[in-house]
């Protein structure tokens, strides 16, 4: 892989974990929508996908994956604490092999707050170094400052209140490989997208890709902690992997075309905001939001990414984020981060509330 300067090995049972960059030990495809909700769906030999459910009261909010190696299990995303317990129970119904690693694709609560549950069950949390950087920015309560994202999430989730934040303890700066000769999983950081610490899990033998929220399948894109322009570029790098099966961060699993669809949504959003809003003042620009929504809704390829008006409507905040990236100006009510967190999906991500 690119950027490989050295190779280290950590023993995991009788298997080996190879670190292909600077790793640090610090503390048959089914069409989208055809997977039974809550079911552990086998997508390859010893490879499973579980579709979560976006909602304030859901146990498993994000999608999960897991790979059963010869001597241990690697889980993709820790989920919330309740989701972690649910996924562990599903794994235990299949195998008694130890769960050694829980890989956080990024720092948001629905992907990382279950780390402590995995630690209690013998696993080590793993993530890109950017996850720690983001946690230091948003988890201020854990790092000795004012209450942060964890404390806000705890207000609405008993499972968070009853657990504690556990940052990942195995970190990598570019890529990290798990390979026991039978299975190979490559954890890859390909650029800024949904956050500044996103990483993916790539299974080259099976051509299965777990994207975290770098790619979702539905109206689930939260843009407050990332960069939409860079996200488009990162998706170019992701598409070069040419996966056959894509386990998205939210929504049904799919095939490689879901990467095209996600990218097309952001490209269209940037094009529309650029042409209709970029030369307008913030007050004038706000009036263009619903017209842009209608235009994108009219595009069959990307319509499912556009949220409807109502309590969980994230589209105005997406417009506001792109407007700010293009102009350097905020559309106050549309782009304020603390207001973004009031949206249902932002709450599910464990983001701060005002």
Each PLM stretch: what is its role?
Residues 28-29, 35, 42, 132-190, ...:
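Metallo-beta-lactamase
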Residues 41-90, 199-211:
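Conserved beta-strand hairpin/beta-sheet module of binuclear metal-dependent hydrolase folds
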Residues 76-78, 100-106, 126-128, 190, ...:
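Active-site neighborhood of phospho(di)ester-bond hydrolases with catalytic His/Asp-centered motifs
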Residues 1-17:
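N-terminal secretory signal peptides and thylakoid transit peptides that target proteins
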Residues 21-50:
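C-terminal segment of N-terminal export signals and the immediately downstream linker at the start
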Residues 71-72, 82-126, 241-242:
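Active-site metal-binding motif and surrounding structural segment of the metallo-beta-lactamase
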Residues 10, 282-354:
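C-terminal regulatory/interaction regions
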Residues 202, 208, 230-288:
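Divalent-metal (often Zn2+) His-rich catalytic cores of metallo-beta-lactamase-fold enzymes
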